[in-house]
Amino acid sequence: QELLDVDGEILRNGGSYYILPAFRGKGGGLELAKTEGETCPLTVVQARSETDRGLPASIWSPPRIAIIRPGFSLNIEFRPRNPSACHRESSLQWKVEEESQQVKIAVKEDARGFGPFRIRPHRDDYKLVYCDEGQKR
């Protein structure tokens, strides 16, 4: 089974995509925001406006394959065209913070906790799932 983007194109390993909600009227795409005393926006959140596509995200699987399929272990990293001063020197790769269970942007010194994420079919759409190393896959 192949994963398709909103244009019906196959998801390419390393491709850049906007991650949008399945249903309109429920907010926009995913972006970064400051939470809990952060000096730079490091938390992945959904944009409030449904017209805001959020930030483009690169989605890739470590194996060198052309197409992303359901259940593949994936890394996700924001790739803004014009990164803010806060993000010019840091990775924008996603990780899950253990204490809060929030998706955060990892700083270069803290590579622990990157992914893996998976894309799974859900009804007529897809959902992103975080897979903790300790969980069954």
From Swiss-Prot:
SMART domains: STI. The record marks R64, I65 as: Reactive bond for trypsin. Keywords: Disulfide bond, Protease inhibitor, Serine protease inhibitor. PROSITE patterns: SOYBEAN_KUNITZ. Gene3D superfamilies: 2.80.10.50. InterPro entries: Kunitz_inhibitor_STI-like_sf, Prot_inh_Kunz-lg. Disulfide bonds join C40-C86. Inhibition of trypsin. This is Kunitz-type trypsin inhibitor alpha chain.
